[in-house]
Amino acid sequence: VALVVTALTGGLGIQGMLELLGTSFVNNRGMAIFIIIMLATGTLERNGLKESAASLIKRFKKVSAGMIVDIYGIFRMIFAAFNVSFGGVAGFVRPIILPMALGTIESKGLEVHPKHEEELKGMASAMENVCWFFGQVLFIGGAGALLVQSTLKDLGYDVTLGQLALVEVPVAITALVVASVYFYLKEKKLAKKYYPGKGQ
């Protein structure tokens, strides 16, 4: 009602209102996709997504929480190179990766320490950010690559998107390796701290 009244009093009319609404939707479709992902994630969580992810990983006794974060990082980097988004921290890390990481601890008969859980949230979120940040520039024509290209052009460097992607490959691989090693070692240290003598 408020939309129609505002359009009519503003002089747009019904046709102008519908045109503006359609144009705004098309121009902001990324936001619409974000909202749809959040709704789908919420629905799946309510119907047992977290529990399914945790029970799946409990079958693998040798896997650690750090390994889950690292494996996710590898897949995230590969998909980021093709500009495929998983929904970020809220859409994928929180409902799927975190329960899997916590499931590795529970599979060893341990109760997850609250501080360890918070650390794992940070590690998984950081891995998402590192891999998305460095991986999206590998996609030729992606927003990240275009931003870097335009910034370099303003600084006097004329580079093609292909050249930029080639230069970015070793940078992305290095970022992934450094992050993976860091999170793996950090998680091992945290496991010893929070579960001493438990073989975690």
Please describe what each predicted stretch is.
Residues 89, 151-200:
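Juxtamembrane and boundary regions of transmembrane helices in multi-pass small-molecule transporters
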Residues 2-9, 37-41, 72-80, 146-150, ...:
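Hydrophobic core segments of alpha-helical transmembrane domains in multi-pass membrane transport
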Residues 66-81, 109-135, 159-173:
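Alpha-helical transmembrane segments of multi-pass membrane proteins
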Residues 1-39, 43, 52-56, 200:
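Hydrophobic transmembrane alpha-helices of multi-pass solute/ion transporters
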Residues 60-105:
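Hydrophobic alpha-helical transmembrane segments of multi-pass integral membrane proteins
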Residues 90-115, 124, 142-162:
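Membrane-interfacial helix-loop connectors
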Residues 102-123, 184-200:
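Intrinsically disordered, low-complexity non-transmembrane regions of multi-pass membrane transporters
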Residues 29-30, 42-51, 81-98, 133-142:
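Short helix-coil transition sites and intra-membrane helix breaks within transmembrane domains
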